[in-house]
Amino acid sequence: TGCSGTGRGGDTASTDGASAGFAADATIGVALPDKTSENWVLAGGLFEDGLKAAGFTGDVQYAPASNTVAEQQNQISAMITNGAKVIVIGAKDGKQLGTQLQQAADAGVKIIAYDRLIENTPNVDFYVAFDNYKVGELQGQALLDGLAARSGHGAPWNIELFSGSPDDANSAVFFNGAMSVLQPKIDDGT
């Protein structure tokens, strides 16, 4: 996946950094929540490779899994101080980055919330994620399909639902998507 645009003359912009409004070797920061999830490690590698291929200097950092959000806050502040033009953030806790995002706005740094919504601040320029509600719907349907496949083996079923981490704003969206599929079945007892 990549980004492109059109130049003033309508020509497709090239992939070098200068066409994006930054020097070809501008630093783009990427702050990810941890290295304990294969998804975040894969994303970090893809960011590193993509930024390098586009001519940018990538500064990809992971907050330690055992640490509080303070380490990610410090990493983001350092990226701003060190001159990052854009910072992509997979938030460790999307409700606790307001100070750093205000610092970014004051410095003219663009912020892209990646995969996890950043709340409690107006200083997010872009949000890039899957359709998390649809993901929840698919999770709910997968549960129903799995239970239907076992319907001859002791139905009805008792299920216990979990909505995810309270510091992940996407948890409620996943849960609501799943419940849009599950609640009608719960209500009618099927």
Per-segment meaning from a language model:
Residues 3-190:
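A residue-level marker of the well-folded mature domains of exported/periplasmic proteins
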